[in-house]
Amino acid sequence: MIDFDGYRPNVGIVICNRKGQVLWAKRCGQNSWQFPQGGINDNESAEQAMYRELHEEVGLQPKDVRLLYVSKHWLRYKLPKRLLRYDSKPMCIGQKQRWFLLQLVSDEKNINMQTTKSPEFDGWRWVSFWYPVRQVVSFKRDVYRKVMKEFASILFTDNPLIFSASREANSLHYSANKKYSQTKYTKRHFYKSRGQ
């Protein structure tokens, strides 16, 4: 489903843990990382699409998370010309997204990126709250900056314990994350970093 302006309606999902870190997912077969996201079907609300994508991409059920906040507005980004499919009608020029902030309330062992025959991701890790804004692919960066700013005002204001833990985590994980982003990792590293 593509709107009259050429944007595909989409949901984005930010999952945080009790330390204020967020789940950062690695796209299959690529050294590219992002938050889970996916299209909204014709017969779905944005919230229904979010829970479907949550299960398909991350393996979590509604009982595994708590919905903290939904972005007030649709946020848009345009695709680079090299990613446009000029032969498709109607042509999609980008995504318009409604973003959801979730807190993981179950064990992280329930996270499973392999629930479908064609998974989107083949690895994940917890990163400090602002890390994704610096690391996401450039054409999504403005949307990530806006959504994380909006979510920060909710998450850190309403959850002082998370706020204090996150400040510490941000200072501890910045150098490690910077080093990590410059290194090519295999699946073995993901499991090792998670203590498995």
Swiss-Prot record:
Matching InterPro entries: Nudix_hydrolase, NUDIX_hydrolase-like_dom_sf, NUDIX_hydrolase_CS, NUDIX_hydrolase_dom, RppH
Cofactor: a divalent metal cation
Keyword set, alphabetical order: Hydrolase
GO annotation, biological process: mRNA catabolic process
One Pfam match: NUDIX
Annotated Nudix hydrolase domain residues: 6-149
GO molecular function: mRNA 5'-diphosphatase activity
This protein's GO CC annotations: cytoplasm
Keyword Hydrolase among UniProt keywords: yes
Tree of life domain: Bacteria
Motif (Nudix box): 38-59
CDD domains, alphabetized: NUDIX_Ap4A_hydrolase_plant_like
Enzyme Commission number, as recorded: 3.6.1.-
Family in the record: Belongs to the Nudix hydrolase family. RppH subfamily.
Classification via HAMAP family: Nudix_RppH
Role according to the record: Accelerates the degradation of transcripts by removing pyrophosphate from the 5'-end of triphosphorylated RNA, leading to a more labile monophosphorylated state that can stimulate subsequent ribonuclease cleavage.
Protein name: RNA pyrophosphohydrolase
Source organism per UniProt: Haemophilus influenzae (strain ATCC 51907 / DSM 11121 / KW20 / Rd)
